[in-house]
Every structure is written in C-alpha cells, then in structure tokens.
Amino acid sequence: MPGIVTTNALNSGIYVRGGNSNENGFLINNMPIAYPDHLTGILSTFDPYILNNSTLFKSGFPARYNSFLSSYINMRPEPGNKHEHEGELTLGLVSSALKARGPIIKNHTSFAASARTSYLQHISRLYNRSMDDKTNPNYMPEYSFSDITATIDSRLSDKWRMTAFGLFSLDHMKMKISEHVQYIFDWHTFSGNVNVSYTPNANEQWDFQFGGKNTYSEGDAFGSVPMGGGNRNYALLGQATYSRRLSDKLNLNSGAKFEYSRFETANKSDDSQNLLIKSSDKDFNLYELYLDINYQLNQNFSLNVGGNYQFYAGETREHSFSPRAKISYTVNKFTLWADYAKTVQYLSLYPYFTVKTPIDIWYPLAKGTQPATCHQYSIGINQEVGQLLSFYAGIFYKDMRNVKDFASDIQTEYSALSNRQIQGKGHAKGLEFDLTLNHHALYMRANYTLSESKRKFAEINNGKAFNPPYDVKHNVMINFSYQISPRLLLNTLWTFSSGVYTTFPKGMVIAQNITEFNDDRPILIPVYTDRYNYKLPNNHRLDASLDYKFGGKNLLFKLSVGAYNVYNQSNPSFVYFQAESADNLTKIIPKSKVMLPFIPYVSLRINW
C-alpha cells in the first residue's frame, strides 16, 4: 500500500508515513500481540492460512486504537471449517509448512492450525562454502525461523460465541563478518488471547477479551567490541467493549481496557559460563476508556467522532486524551475524505546496532518524561471506474512531540537505559498515489509515495534537525499478474526505495588487551560524532514466480517456481567496517552485508 515502506531484509518492520517501525500496533481481534519479526521478506510474517482477513489504519483511527503513533493492523483469524476436515502440505527449497482445519464438534466448534519452518540457513551455508575469495569473504547471514499458529472458534449458543488464538515464533541468525568476527542473534515471541462475544439482539453486542504476549531476544558479538545481553517483555491484557446501533444512521462503540507490562534487560557476564546478569527491570499499568460515534448525515456525508482517554502508571504518571474525527463525502463511486487523529505512545526502542534489528530493546517511559504524541492530518480521494480501474491519492502531515531516542554514550552493554532516554520533536509529510487495473486475466497495481521525515533532539547532532534512518523519500511498488491459462499464473513484483540514513564513524581507535598474550590481534573501536551522517544506496529488486495448478477430485496440487531478487541486486542490509593493510598502511573500509542475493526456489503445495 502507498505510504508503507520497508528498508532492508534485516528489518522486517514496516514504516508508515514517515514513522518508525516501532510505532505500529499489530492486533488479533483488536487485542495487541507481539510482532514475530520474521526477516527476509520471502515468507509472510503472519500465515495467511490462519490470518487471511486484515484491516490497516494509517489515519482516521477509530477511538479504540491508541498507544502507537503511526498505524494499526487488525487481523481476524480464519474460523475453520465446522463441517469437514481439510489440510495443506507445502514442501520447498526455502521452507515447508503443514496446515489443517476442520470441526472439533461438528456444526459447533472448529479449529485451524499451521506449522512453518524455513531452510534459509542451509542455503546460506552452501553459498558461504562456495565463495572463491577466502581472504576477504562476503558471508551470507545464516537465518532460520519456525512458527506455530492456531485458532479455535465455538458457537456456544445463538447469543454466545467464543474464539481463542495463539502464535509462537522462534528465530535464529548468525552473521559472520570474518573468520574472527561474528554476531549471533536469537529471538522468540508468544501471543495468545480469548474472546467471548454476547449478542442479545441484532442491535447490540458485548465483547470480553483476555490475553497475554511475550518477547525475548538475546545477542552476542564475538571478535569485535565485546557486547551482548538479553531482554524480555511480557504483558497481560484485558478489555470489554460494547457496540450498539441506535438507529439506521447512528452507531456507538465504547470500551474499557487494562494492560500490565514488564520489561527486563540483562548484560552478558564476563565469566566462562556466558550467563546473563540482571541489569534493570521496569513495569507499568495502563488504563483506558474510549467512545466512538458513527453518524450518516445524509445520502452523501458520513461523520465519525470519538475520543480515547488513558492513564499510565509507571516510573512516571501520565493522563492523556486523544480526540479523533473523520468526515467523508461519497457520490456514485467517488469518495472525498478528511480526518484528524491524535495518538500517544509510551514505548521506545533502543537499537543494538546503527540499524534496526530484531534484538533491539523495548523500553517504557523513564522518570520525568512524557509520552510521545502525534497529531496527524490527512485528506484523500478514491475513484472507481466500473470494475476495471480504481485510483487513490492522499496527502498527510504529522506533527510529533516528545518522541524518544537514547543518548549516544551506550554502545557495549544492556545497561540501565532510563538515565539516557531523551525527548525531541519531529514531523513527517507526504503524498501518496495508488492505481489498480483489473481486467479479465490481467491484474496490475502500482503505487508511489513521496515523503519527508525529520527529527530534532537537543542532545543529538548539536540540536540540528536530521533525517532519521527510516526517512524514505521515494518509494515505488509495481505488481503484475497474468492468468496465462486456468492452471497457469505469472506473478511479478518490483520495488524501489530511496536509500536510508545510517551512522558512519569518523575514525577508529585501536585497543589491545595487555594482560593476556594468547591473542595479539588488536580490536578496532569506531569513533562516532554525528548520527545518521551517511545515506545508503537506493534499494530495488524484482521477484517473480510461476504457479501451475493440477490435480484430481481429492487432491489438488500447486507447483511454484520462482526467484527472489531476480537480477541479484546487492541491497545492503548491514554496514560494518573492516581494516585492510597494504604497504605498511592500514585503511578502514566500509563493507556491507547482503541478506539475500538471487535465490531461486521451487515448492509443491498439496491440498485435500
């Protein structure tokens, strides 16, 4: 979609309208979950076999959504098949999956479940072994993931319904810079929730939800500046909502929420057992009330107004009220709309490196700080031309206050971060265009986003405004599909995005351990001054696939052949620095890691 970009394969997060990737809320049945952070972009982060229905809000947020500045993605699980069992098996070079759904109690209770795993680490190892240049190798990161997703849907009676959802994910990555320098990352998540709905009549509904989420990550660096540690975040959540249709023109939605969150960080100890020692623990309670009113003024105009109140109780206590408003005008197949929304956020993300990684540390408000706030204004139009063509254009502006970052004197350990959390301000603005053509066997979609994002902190870059590492000026996506025959489908996807800013050191300091003589290799320590002082090259790539369907009465097959990064574009995912010596001179050369070069794949999907 326009206004949404990704930066590199090492970062699975999305950046919405100039915001950071930690400013997006992911929800299942309106209940927040932990983001799994699967990398590469080859495989979807969430399994569409279970989560095949989602709604994205990047402006005009309903009042029930708060605590994230940029966007909300609400996904609704597949209820399963209450009449008969069905399954799916996928076997491929990159990944495999086993999926099933069917009745637990026929016509009453059903389930859907999925288990996926990847083999990318084996492809990486083969690639690394095949390299000819052993003196200056460019190793491909070894990455793997597995996840399990499950849901249960039960119709308890004509008025009562219960659903349950669970998602567990496990990821591992080893990134080898040289024979002596490597990074090892591990992270996993768990999310689960239960929803009970009561519908006394056709005009009103009650929902009661309970859930929890947990994330854990651990990182180690070997052969460079010693660094490593782990962090954990878990939360307990509950909410009750009430919806009522007061008339054909007026609808009301209201609710109350509660969240308890705890954050634990630990440093890697120096002993041989490689233990994690506790560094800091933080927690908070969040209480929330909201009200939404939807009113159809007449045949053409509709109005949505609402408000969200939150009370945050942690190291600091904060009250916030977030108003929302949206007005739409529709005539025939043309829609013009304008909206305003205030959002607040209490969490920030401390980066482990100069680029975002899945092991970055979530951290709540420090004492004496205020929640980040965003005031967003946007207008847009939608125009449909029959069943053939649709066009969208939009413009937005975001004014952000009390956005968070961290002082630059933390580099090597997961120490207490509260004293180094800093506040600043920023803005984002942009234009969005989207064009979709759907004509018989041909489908094409193209969108373009022009945007600018700025941040300003007194403690960073001498108080000068700067482009953050998620400022992507130009972003283009072109998707083309052609149904060659009833059995054969061609898919292509080309993406382009402007290079993002990263932090390059101004120099290096050589350090050496003079107390131990078993290793005389010096350690190079980078010296940083300004942040985000270098712009990486533009990113672009082409993905293509050809799907062939065949089968009989009981078994259906789909054979997929394709390639990721067809023309082998070297899009940098990670930048590092390496010393190269010649003629008694040593130069510090910037290097980059490509997460995924050209990778062909073949997979066979079997449905029954």
Residue ranges and their predicted role:
Residues 487, 495-522, 537-543, 547-608:
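C-terminal beta-signal and adjacent terminal beta-strands/loops
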Residues 299-300, 397-399, 421-506:
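Gram-negative outer-membrane beta-barrel transporters
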Residues 94-117, 133-172, 184-206, 244-250, ...:
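Transmembrane beta-barrel wall of Gram-negative outer-membrane proteins
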Residues 45-84, 88, 97-99:
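A beta-strand signature from Gram-negative outer-membrane beta-barrel systems
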Residues 157, 165-167, 247-253, 257, ...:
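Structural signature of Gram-negative outer-membrane beta-barrels, strongest in the C-terminal barrel
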Residues 235-239, 280-290, 366, 370, ...:
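Outer membrane beta-barrel strand-and-loop segments of large Gram-negative receptors
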Residues 216, 267, 315, 329, ...:
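Surface-exposed extracellular loop regions of Gram-negative outer-membrane beta-barrel proteins
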